[in-house]
Amino acid sequence: MAVAAAAAAGPVFWRRLLGLLPGRPGLAALLGRLSDRLGRNRDRQRRRSPWLLLAPLLSPAVPQVTSPPCCLCPEGVHRFQWIRNLVPEFGVSSSHVRVLSSPAESFELMKGQIRVAKRRVVMASLYLGTGPLEQELVDCLESTLEKSLQAKFPSNLKVSILLDFTRGSRGRKNSRTMLLPLPQRFPEQVRVSLFHTPHLRGLLRLLIPERFNETIGLQHIKVYLFDNSVILSGANLSDSYFTNRQDRYVFLQDCAEIADFFTELVDAVGDVSLQLQGDDTVQVVDGMVHPYKGDRTEYCKAANKRVMDVINSARTRQQMLHAQTFHSNSLLTQEDAAAAGDRRPAPDTWIYPLIQMKPFEIQIDEIVTETLLTEAERGAKVYLTTGYFNLTQAYMDLVLGTRAEYQILLASPEVNGFFGAKGVVGAIPAAYVHIERQFYSEVCSLGQQERVQLQEYWRRGWTFHAKGLWLYLAGSSLPCLTLIGSPNFGYRSVHRDLEAQIAIVTENEALQQQLHQEQEQLYLRSGVVSSATFEQPSRQVKLWVKMVTPLIKNFF
């Protein structure tokens, strides 16, 4: 509360605080964005304030330590170091980071990692499909669990799966029925958690049809973890995502600290979710408020505490680890370290987990993304991609109002996941075309066509679901930062769903080249949007769709 009181004291507080940050443009921009947000929200009576996110900056949870020298703040990427004031910073060698290029590669890697897992398998997704490929994945899990029991020295293998309740319960055959044999056969080793948004309750829950109740809010995090290795992606566990639905994937191999963090994060969300039982019923964790039957405010407060405890404790651990590493390096020469057998390569890549759970008043990803867009200077290039082009007003204003060059990749109607669907849902691609045309018109009216360019992805027989961004600093032909994970940069991602992605910051040229090639391969399958694009027959939007889109755009 002291933070909010200090912020309310007025501009003098901010001048003094920003004066303490020479040479920290990122953090200064972050505080500036938050100051603007407080001004907009000050008159709203809200139980919790996003200003609480500033607490780690003003009242650190751990003692202040001397910042390491340039080994942790390399030239050119040091400007992103401010992110660690909000989330844990994980320094790794770029040799442990691999960008995957195709759905098939991701699927085969996932199965291979499950087969050799000894300690833990943690999988968070929107849903698990019901086809033969999804069954193959379940069979892999079952086989690995069986082997763990039959081994000469039985392992402590644990499997934790987190899905969305509404999406995972749709239809008679669904994610729950696919997974049910696992908790039935291995009740001591398997946990299946189903997150239910606290905003779908009461009469609303009774009236909204099954296919549409997902619009209120979802568990949208996609993390696939095997022992100490992690796949971060935007892809769900469904056949199209294993074959012909284009997404992004990064494999973090033997990164124990990152694996520990995401295990704890999934456990935290699992604790505030419903637990699947062997008889296909669900139960609340003992002592937890029910997500849609209990008091919503109390539930959200408990969920906020559970998740923020994970983030803050990991941040504290990493700060202490950085301090110890810095102290040890100052005492030991490289020869001493080699003689002692420490052959670990120095970190040249930094991973920052960015969490967005607005229902729980956690908006770290939003703050970091807005600050990155704010700081992108003249000459910098931002490649931003989303499968569902529906930017929030804040992101749109930053794209149109800052100086960096933007190339925005989005799905053409034919590769939109809803293309050809029956009923009202089939009009969703047209709604996205309408939103795209409105944005393009605004770009043109501002004379920004050279600086902000739209491109549409098209690939015969495929759909498009990739999201994220690549940041190229001014004068550089390779990206030094990428965001990869579940957020789509739209209203849902920011306000309704549970999201997670990572910021990868690297000074390693080989990894930068991997990221650059990933970006190029996606954009090579696209065409530049012009006024002629919207004259095509496939871009004609019916009047009723134009009228309805402003009313429903916040739900997709």
Swiss-Prot record:
GO terms for biological process: cardiolipin biosynthetic process. The keyword 4Fe-4S does not apply. Residues 1-28 form a transit peptide. Activated by calcium and magnesium and inhibited by other bivalent cations. Pathway: Phospholipid metabolism; phosphatidylglycerol biosynthesis; phosphatidylglycerol from CDP-diacylglycerol: step 1/2. Its main location: mitochondrion. The active site is at H220, K222, D227. It is found in: Mitochondrion. ATP binds at A124, S125, L126, Y127, L128, G129, T130, G131. Its EC number is 2.7.8.5. InterPro entries: PGS1 (IPR016270), PLipase_D/transphosphatidylase (IPR001736). Belongs to the CDP-alcohol phosphatidyltransferase class-II family. PANTHER family: CDP-DIACYLGLYCEROL--GLYCEROL-3-PHOSPHATE 3-PHOSPHATIDYLTRANSFERASE, MITOCHONDRIAL, CDP-DIACYLGLYCEROL--SERINE O-PHOSPHATIDYLTRANSFERASE. This is CDP-diacylglycerol--glycerol-3-phosphate 3-phosphatidyltransferase, mitochondrial. It comes from Pongo abelii. The lineage of its organism: Eukaryota, Metazoa, Chordata, Craniata, Vertebrata.
